[in-house]
């Protein structure tokens, strides 16, 4: 699936929490040929970053933790250099992330990350999911919610952090392809991604366009 037999294919899945990006990454690992290394936000934030610096690259929009915010560009740079190194060794990489630039000031992280993978085959996928479905998924995982609940829950206001994610994560909206997890299963999303890879990454690719985006 790579344009160069000596480099691994890279797939970046960009979306908000509960958008279904992690499930797509797992489907790719299970279904695609060869090893696909998952270097996404959950691995980096939960298992690599020290607890006192979490949520690391998962820092949500809103500029709420300036002590962590100042480290986020460094964390992302190191992660993307690791992705580049895996690809250089011929390993395929899938990374589910939540890129945004809603910090105390614009940091230009996505453009910087794109430059770090400039010479590699990268498919940048926007993972979309309507906010009402995101809320359903959040409610379904609440530990105190009755599994046998029969009455429809009363409408709840969408929390501000959820709205911020929905507004910020798909800016500037430059992708090679998009999937909507409200209409496609993770397996179907993975198959759509496979089809795009077999067809070829558009030229110029999303990451090539993002290198010059401000």
Feature map (PLM): residue ranges:
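Walker A/P-loop
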Residues: 22
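ATP-binding Walker
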Residues: 19
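Conserved substrate/cofactor phosphate-moiety recognition/catalytic segment
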Residues: 26-74, 84
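Small-molecule kinase domains that catalyze NTP-dependent phosphoryl transfer to phosphate-bearing small molecules
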Residues: 128, 136-192, 203-214
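ATP-dependent NMP and nucleoside kinases share a basic, alpha-helical "lid"
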Residues: 87, 98-144
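Hydrophobic anchor at the beta1->P-loop junction of P-loop NTPases
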Residues: 13
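P-loop (Walker A) phosphate-binding loop of NTP-binding proteins
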Residues: 16
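Pre-Walker A (Motif I) flank of P-loop NTPase domains
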Residues: 6-10, 90-91
């Amino acid at each position: 699936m790579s344009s160069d037999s000596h480099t691994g294919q890279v797939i970046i899945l960009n979306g908000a929490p509960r958008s279904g990006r992690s499930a797509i990454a797992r489907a790719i690992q299970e279904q695609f040929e060869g090893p696909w290394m998952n270097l996404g936000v959950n691995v980096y934030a939960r298992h690599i970053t020290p607890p006192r610096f979490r949520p690391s690259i998962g820092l949500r929009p809103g500029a709420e933790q300036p002590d962590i915010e100042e480290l986020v560009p460094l964390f992302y740079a190191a992660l993307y250099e690791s992705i580049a190194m895996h690809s250089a060794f011929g390993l395929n990489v899938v990374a589910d992330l939540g890129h945004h630039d809603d910090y105390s000031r614009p940091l230009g992280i996505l453009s910087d990350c794109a430059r770090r993978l400039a010479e590699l085959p990268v498919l940048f996928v926007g993972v979309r999911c309507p906010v009402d479905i995101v809320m359903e998924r959040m409610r379904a995982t609440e530990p105190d919610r009755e599994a046998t609940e029969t009455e429809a829950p009363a409408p709840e206001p969408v929390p501000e952090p959820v709205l911020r994610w929905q507004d910020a994560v798909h800016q500037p909206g430059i992708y090679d392809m998009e999937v909507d997890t409200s209409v496609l299963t993770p397996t179907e999303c993975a198959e759509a991604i496979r089809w795009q890879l077999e067809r070829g990454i558009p030229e110029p690719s999303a990451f090539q366009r993002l290198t010059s985006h401000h």
